[in-house]
Swiss-Prot record:
Name assigned to this protein: Holliday junction branch migration complex subunit RuvB
SUPFAM superfamilies: P-loop containing nucleoside triphosphate hydrolases, Winged helix' DNA-binding domain
Subunit note: Homohexamer. Forms an RuvA(8)-RuvB(12)-Holliday junction (HJ) complex. HJ DNA is sandwiched between 2 RuvA tetramers; dsDNA enters through RuvA and exits via RuvB. An RuvB hexamer assembles on each DNA strand where it exits the tetramer. Each RuvB hexamer is contacted by two RuvA subunits (via domain III) on 2 adjacent RuvB subunits; this complex drives branch migration. In the full resolvosome a probable DNA-RuvA(4)-RuvB(12)-RuvC(2) complex forms which resolves the HJ.
Pfam families: AAA_lid_4, RuvB_C, RuvB_N
Annotated spans, Head domain (RuvB-H): 258-342
Protein family according to the UniProt entry: Belongs to the RuvB family.
Cellular localization per UniProt: Cytoplasm
Enzyme Commission no: 3.6.4.-
Domain notes: Has 3 domains, the large (RuvB-L) and small ATPase (RuvB-S) domains and the C-terminal head (RuvB-H) domain. The head domain binds DNA, while the ATPase domains jointly bind ATP, ADP or are empty depending on the state of the subunit in the translocation cycle. During a single DNA translocation step the structure of each domain remains the same, but their relative positions change.
Function: The RuvA-RuvB-RuvC complex processes Holliday junction (HJ) DNA during genetic recombination and DNA repair, while the RuvA-RuvB complex plays an important role in the rescue of blocked DNA replication forks via replication fork reversal (RFR). RuvA specifically binds to HJ cruciform DNA, conferring on it an open structure. The RuvB hexamer acts as an ATP-dependent pump, pulling dsDNA into and through the RuvAB complex. RuvB forms 2 homohexamers on either side of HJ DNA bound by 1 or 2 RuvA tetramers; 4 subunits per hexamer contact DNA at a time.
Residues that bind ATP: 23-24, 65, 68-70, 131-133, 174, 184, 221
SS bonds (residue pairs): none
Amino acid sequence: MEENFDIREQQLTTKERDFENALRPLNFEDFSGQDKVVDNLRIFVKAARLRAEALDHVLLHGPPGLGKTTLSNIIANELGVGFKVTSGPVLDKPGDLAGVLTSLEPNDVLFIDEIHRLSPVVEEYLYSAMEDYRIDIMIDKGPSARSIQLELSPFTLVGATTRSGLLTAPLRARFGINLHLEYYDDDVLTSIIRRSATILNVPCDVKAAGEIASRSRGTPRIANALLRRVRDFAQVKGSGRIDVEIARFALEALNIDRYGLDEIDNKILCTIIDKFKGGPVGLTTIATALGEDAGTIEEVYEPFLIKEGFLKRTPRGREVTELAYMHLGRSIYNSQKTLFDD
């Protein structure tokens, strides 16, 4: 049995990133799900092409793994322009930003992942670049310091964030197109898994794809990660074909239950129940008890637990729901913090 398999791991290895890139759709036609977002982007992109100008700046926000990077690449492909990728933490100082911006060709797309992590000083420099296609930078230091203005080619900034609430109001206001990505339903994920299996030349039954989809937390990145692991089991424990039996066997071995919850999800719920009588309890306290980063819990784990009804946020903190007790086979604490059984 494989232990501590984190299907939401943010730091991908080179091999895993190559795997993801091989499965990415390159145009709107091949992109599944997010219908409203895609339909709107089709119109915005077509209008920009008709006017032969840069597309307005785009902000994509939502939980990890829903296709923000893929959509950004598709935007560039559909516009027929260059595509450059960077991230908020990488742009450490204004000179880093200036180097990227001055390398852009007219109407290119610049993708900044984790844009909420831009340093305040870099963000200030970005304002004029987004509005006026120019940037002012300081040359030298002390008495000889002077400011020079660099003219930039028109470009489209696509910013991606999993925590849109951390964006400053001035930065958010400079995005003309603001789009939120939702979790995917099982039918769409099933089609994504079958497409990925075809690309990987792995036979995969429809029911098996549906089984993987139902445990993928509404997230294509997780669906593809699970497909890769189930493929391993199919090749070693089976005939190489992914059927529903081998899919279920593999997912159980990976501790992915029928709700898509893994060992860490269940540990969060159990900690709140066992140590804090079901809550409410503060996020920082939960993080300390688990030895996890509070931001990671809030950004990576909580959204799905809340969406599926296992956890809720209250003014006094996090609290597990009746569904969580039922899922874990636990008794429920009443409001006086005494136990009772149904």
